[in-house]
């Protein structure tokens, strides 16, 4: 009977694959997998399933006896994939049959070089989901997302591009040069394709692109011993351990602050103002974006898009580029030199000092005329407005956690307190992230999670890998989908998508997974919370960004809304405390 069911399922899937002309993924438990493998061996028919050709995409093992969602523990599962008649499978990668096998090797090299799979991966490794990696590669390249090596993907492999990875290892956010200090650069060995003067002028013009829209200023220096950005041309191995590949392919690469150096492949034919060769100005402006702290963009019209699109005589920065650079350095206020910006800071300090003296009286009046506090003044570290986690309970009360403390963000009855006193004495001092799922509240810290019911029944801490296999420690934020039961975890620049059965389905850069992602969120978020059935709020650096959950689209791009003001409004004591702190700092600076 079991064999009959398996045959029926296999034949049905094969027919459905033919009708839809698309691959289909199926999950079998270990017992069924043994049966179907035996069946294939006995009959000599693989029924269109790719497993006999080593196309196993993902194997997940989980033993979770504490499944509090009411579901059963997940068995060892193997995901199999059917293919259409026009596709073949090579080492775990589904390939259109008219694609040369050499492209498979090149695709794997690209996926490694640009951060989609670990370096040194072996073809067909069961723990590497090449389909997911290809989907991300296609999404960042702005082409159709099929998850297979098709003609469009093969063409993208041959497109000249920047050598900086699309997916960088985890780095802390906000990497940038200090504001109000000119960024210095120097010239090293230059190309012989053009005159030295012409090359330097184009490179200066590339810096000016970023100067025009931000508060940045640049200064050219001759001594390269202590310069911020060193510029040079070189071929193949050129001294930084990241070799160029000859003409075509990688055109240049650069390093993020506080290195910032930019290198250009001297094997390219660099040109100025012509469609032939490779336009020096456009490539340099892109690389200097990296030198200033920008990552790649999946917006095809953006300068920071990783692929070279040819000479554009009407070049302008895209809105996405401007949002990125101003999120790091602020907008150009009209000042053109570092020295003209410094007096602005002094004037601001003076004005704020005067204002603070006035509002100090208001804060004093507030404690006697508006609403007497029923709780003591919060400690200063609880008034920063920087949250570790945000959670909404079953009564629709929203709590923001900051270190040892929490805020209840409620216009009618705002309050604060110690996290352990409100949520449980067995919680750690610092919670990384949290979310609500039915009657359960989940809290994450380090490599462990804690959970309790709405009746305050608590469960012991549990390692991540008991429930979410593949989730890294020290996550930044988490939320659970309202309809599908999917859970999204955030760590650095990545979002980890887990199915309702807690299987890792995908790891993607935040910027490529959500639509219209604000630049401030591309290298990480502080917290996420569902505020109602429509919107999620993403918190970062004193601001929150609203996203429609059903479409995964941000709606107040690019600047967000301030939640520092929310704290000031809801918690009068915090506002009073912060004002007194600022008065003290202003008084000290004026002495």
From Swiss-Prot:
Q: What is its EC class?
A: hydrolase
Q: Where is the signal peptide, in residue numbers? A: 1-18
User: In this chain's numbering, which residues are marked as the site (Cleavage)?
Assistant: 450-451, 503-504
SUPFAM superfamilies found in the cross-reference section? Hemopexin-like domain, Metalloproteases ('zincins'), catalytic domain, PGBD-like
What this protein catalyses is:
Hydrolysis of proteins of the fertilization envelope and dimethylcasein
A Pfam entry, by short name: Peptidase_M10
Cystine pairs: 383-586
The active site is formed by 287
GO-annotated biological processes = collagen catabolic process; extracellular matrix organization; proteolysis
Composition bias, kind Low complexity: at what positions?
A: 336-348, 356-372
Q: Does the keyword Glycoprotein apply?
A: yes
Keywords of this protein's UniProt record, alphabetized? Autocatalytic cleavage, Calcium, Disulfide bond, Glycoprotein, Hydrolase, Metal-binding, Metalloprotease, Protease, Repeat, Signal, Zinc, Zymogen
Q: What is known of its domains?
A: There are two distinct domains in this protein; the catalytic N-terminal, and the C-terminal which is involved in substrate specificity.
This protein is called what? 50 kDa hatching enzyme
Could you tell me which species this protein originates from? Hemicentrotus pulcherrimus (Sea urchin)
């Amino acid at each position: 009977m079991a064999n009959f069911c398996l045959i029926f399922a296999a034949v049905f899937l094969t027919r459905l694959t033919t009708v839809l002309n698309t691959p289909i993924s199926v999950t079998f438990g270990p017992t069924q997998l043994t049966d179907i493998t035996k069946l294939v061996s006995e009959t000599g028919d693989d029924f269109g399933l790719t497993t006999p050709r080593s196309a196993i995409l993902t194997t997940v093992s989980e033993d979770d006896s504490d499944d509090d969602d009411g579901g059963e523990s997940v068995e060892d599962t193997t995901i199999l994939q059917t293919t259409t008649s026009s596709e073949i499978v090579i080492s775990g990668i589904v390939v259109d049959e008219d694609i040369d096998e050499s492209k498979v090797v090149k695709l794997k090299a690209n996926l490694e070089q640009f951060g989609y799979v670990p370096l040194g991966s072996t073809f067909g490794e069961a723990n590497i989901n090449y389909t997911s990696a290809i989907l991300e590669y296609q999404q960042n390249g702005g082409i159709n997302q099929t998850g297979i090596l098709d003609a469009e993907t093969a063409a993208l492999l041959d497109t000249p591009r920047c050598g900086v990875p699309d997916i960088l290892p985890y780095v802390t956010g906000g990497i940038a040069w200090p504001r109000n200090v000119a960024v210095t650069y120097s010239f090293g060995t230059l190309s012989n394709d053009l005159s030295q003067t012409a090359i330097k002028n184009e490179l200066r013009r590339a810096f000016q692109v970023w100067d025009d829209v931000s508060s940045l200023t640049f200064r050219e220096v001759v001594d390269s011993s202590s310069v911020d950005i060193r510029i040079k041309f070189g071929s193949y191995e050129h001294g930084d351990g990241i070799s160029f590949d000859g003409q075509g392919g990688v055109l240049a690469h650069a390093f993020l602050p506080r290195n910032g150096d930019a290198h250009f492949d001297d094997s390219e034919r660099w040109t100025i103002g012509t469609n032939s060769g490779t336009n020096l100005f456009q490539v340099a402006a892109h690389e200097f974006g990296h030198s200033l702290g920008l990552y790649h963009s999946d917006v095809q019209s953006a300068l920071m898009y990783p692929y070279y699109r040819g000479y554009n005589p009407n070049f302008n920065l895209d809105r996405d580029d401007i949002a990125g650079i101003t999120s790091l350095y602020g907008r150009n206020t009209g000042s053109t030199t570092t020295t003209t910006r410094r007096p602005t800071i002094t004037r601001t300090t003076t004005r704020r000092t005067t204002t603070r003296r006035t509002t100090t009286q208001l804060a004093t009046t507030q404690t006697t005329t508006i609403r007497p506090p029923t709780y003591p003044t919060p400690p200063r570290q609880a008034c920063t407005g920087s949250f570790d986690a945000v959670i909404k309970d079953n009564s629709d009360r929203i709590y923001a956690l900051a270190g040892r403390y929490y805020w209840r963000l409620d216009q009618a009855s705002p309050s604060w307190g110690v996290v352990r006193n409100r949520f449980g004495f067995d919680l750690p001092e610092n919670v990384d992230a949290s979310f609500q799922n039915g009657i359960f509240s989940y809290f994450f810290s380090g490599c462990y999670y804690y959970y309790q019911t709405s009746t305050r029944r608590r469960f012991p801490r549990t390692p991540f890998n008991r429930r979410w296999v593949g989730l890294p420690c020290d996550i930044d934020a988490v939320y659970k989908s309202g309809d599908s039961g999917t859970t999204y975890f955030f760590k650095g620049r990545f979002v980890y998508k887990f199915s309702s059965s807690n299987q890792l389905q995908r790891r993607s850069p935040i910027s490529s997974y959500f639509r219209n992602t604000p630049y401030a969120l591309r290298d990480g978020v502080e917290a996420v919370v569902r505020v109602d059935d429509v919107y999620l709020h993403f918190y970062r650096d004193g601001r929150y960004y609203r996203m429609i959950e059903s479409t995964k689209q941000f709606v107040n791009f690019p600047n967000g809304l301030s939640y520092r003001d929310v704290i000031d409004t809801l918690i009068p004591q915090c506002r009073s405390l912060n004002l007194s702190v600022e008065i003290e700092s202003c008084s000290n600076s004026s002495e």
